Amino acid sequence: MDIRSYMASPGEGPLDNLKPDGGLCGIFRTMGCIGDSLSSGEFEELDADGVKHYHDYYEYSWGQYIARAAGIKVYNFSKGGMTAKRYCEEFAESRGFWNPELACQAYTIALACNDVNHIELGSADDIDVSDWHNNKPTFAGYYGQIIMRYKEIQPKARFFLLTLPHGFNSKNADKVSPASQIIRDVADKFEWTYVVDLERYLPPVDDDFRRRFYLGGHLNAAG
């Protein structure tokens, strides 16, 4: 056995050595997945009248696959169509997601897909790191509020922020890279906060990708 095969090597990319057992996610006992449809195991349905419907099937979400693979507890703090603004203003409160009894050792935040269509992006300067009540009402401000409120609940939690992949949003494609850069800038403002850089490392969302990983016009659970 070569023990080096279990260690990160210089220059190794995040997709170069995939771990079927959940990898180092297993060091956490609890994880919360904050996000939209892409954190919710979404399925697009086309009914007999040609009308599209969208369904959250959390058991198919990548968070629950991590839970089963790594043997940890994962909470889906997510819903299709979610934005950072809605999460802060009503969704999390209505679902009890600010409840300290649901405090997690780690959180993933996968938001921006819908935000780029509905709100000013702003910048990381919209965040008052001393008091989230002073954050500006922009995507960046609400995004920062989410981190800060969960840090109040679990000060030692680790946060993993997901950027947006290229090619998934044709409506506001020009906002995808700026939104991803804001997410990177937000991560720099907080301790124990890291970036899962899908924009940099994810395979391109091209026609072949869509054929394999889409149901209609929406990513399927595998995608």
Where are the model-predicted features located?
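Serine-esterase "nucleophile elbow" of acetyl-processing enzymes
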Residues: 2-78, 96-97
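Structural recognition of the beta-strand scaffold that forms the well-ordered cores
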Residues: 30-35, 39, 74-78, 105-110, ...
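Solvent-exposed loop/turn segments at secondary-structure junctions
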Residues: 37-40, 79-85, 113-118, 165-169, ...
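Acidic/histidine-rich helix-loop elements
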Residues: 40-57, 78-86, 123-134, 216
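Oxyanion-hole/transition-state-stabilizing segment in secreted/luminal serine hydrolases
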Residues: 86-137, 167
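Generic structural signal for well-ordered alpha-helices
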Residues: 143-148, 180
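Proline-centered flexible-loop/turn and helix-kink motifs
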Residues: 155-156, 191
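Catalytic His-Asp segment of secreted/periplasmic serine-dependent ester chemistry enzymes
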Residues: 164-223
